[in-house]
C-alpha cells in the first residue's frame, strides 16, 4: 500500500493551459512579440515559467533579458487570471477526496512558481488537506531534479517505496525516476502518451479513478 501520493499540478490535477497561454500571449503582445495558439503551449510548459517564456519568444530574441521582461508582464496578469478557464480534470476531485478519507497523504510537486501553485490548489481543492504544496521555490532546482520530492518525503515521513508520483509529462516521469519512487503517467494532460512511454513508468492510466487501484 502507498502512504503518499505526489501529484504534478498543471496537466495532472488541473487543466491550466488556456490561462497560461492567454497570460503569456498578453505579455508577448505588450512587448510587441508574436503570440501563439493555445494548443502550441502544450509543448512549451512543464519546465518552469522562465523556460516557457524562452520557448515562446521568437528566434533571436531568447535572451535572459527578454525572458525577464516577459515575466514582468506575465506575473501580475496571471495572478489575476490564473483561474479564469482552469478546471480540475474529470474525476480528480473525487479521487482526492477518496484518498483523503482513506488516510493517504497527498502532496503537490509543481514547476509553477510557488505563489500561483498555492493559490490554485487552495482555490480548486479547499476541502483537501495536502501534506505539502510545493512549486518552484527560490534556490531549489526545478523538476526533473528530485529535490522537490525529497523535501516532500521529509514532511510526510515516509519511505520512497511508500510513494506514488503522478504526472502527465516526461519531466514528471524523469523526476520520479531520479527520486527513486514509483511513477504513474496520466494521458489526459498536456503531453502525448508516447512521451510518457519513453520513460517506462510502472503505471499509466487514462482515467483518474484507476489510480485508486495503484495505491492499495
Where are the model-predicted features located?
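Active-site neighborhood of HAD-like aspartate-dependent phosphohydrolases
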Residues: 1-43
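Generic enzyme active-site microenvironment
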Residues: 6-8, 109, 166
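Asp-based, Mg2+/Mn2+-dependent phosphohydrolase catalytic module
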Residues: 1-3, 114, 118-216
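Substrate-recognition element of Asp-dependent hydrolases with the DxDx(T/V) motif
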Residues: 92-122
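Metal-dependent phosphoesterase signature
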Residues: 55-94, 102
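Helix-loop "lid/cap" segments that line or gate small-molecule binding pockets
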Residues: 27-28, 48-63, 120, 152-153
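An amphipathic alpha-helix signature
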Residues: 21, 25, 42, 46-54, ...
Amino acid at each position: 500500500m502507498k502512504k503518499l501520493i505526489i501529484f504534478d499540478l498543471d496537466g495532472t490535477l488541473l487543466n491550466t493551459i488556456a490561462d497560461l497561454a492567454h497570460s503569456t500571449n498578453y505579455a508577448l503582445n505588450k512587448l510587441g512579440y508574436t503570440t501563439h495558439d493555445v494548443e502550441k503551449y502544450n509543448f512549451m510548459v512543464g519546465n518552469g515559467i522562465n523556460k516557457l517564456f524562452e520557448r515562446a519568444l521568437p528566434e533571436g530574441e531568447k535572451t535572459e533579458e527578454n525572458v525577464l521582461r516577459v515575466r514582468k508582464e506575465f506575473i501580475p496578469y496571471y495572478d489575476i487570471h490564473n483561474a479564469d478557464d482552469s478546471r480540475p480534470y474529470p474525476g480528480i476531485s473525487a479521487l482526492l477526496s477518496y484518498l483523503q478519507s482513506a488516510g493517504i497523504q497527498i502532496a503537490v510537486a509543481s514547476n509553477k512558481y510557488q505563489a500561483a501553485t498555492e493559490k490554485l490548489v487552495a482555490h480548486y481543492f479547499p476541502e483537501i488537506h495536502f501534506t505539502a504544496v510545493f512549486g518552484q521555490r527560490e534556490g531549489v532546482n526545478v523538476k526533473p531534479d528530485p529535490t522537490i520530492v525529497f523535501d516532500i518525503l521529509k514532511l510526510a515521513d515516509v519511505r520512497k517505496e511508500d510513494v506514488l508520483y503522478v504526472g502527465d509529462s516526461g519531466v514528471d516521469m524523469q523526476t520520479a525516476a531520479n527520486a527513486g519512487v514509483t511513477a504513474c503517467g496520466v494521458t489526459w494532460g498536456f503531453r502525448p502518451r508516447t512521451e510518457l512511454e519513453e520513460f517506462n513508468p510502472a503505471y499509466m492510466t487514462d482515467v483518474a479513478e484507476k489510480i485508486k487501484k495503484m495505491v492499495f
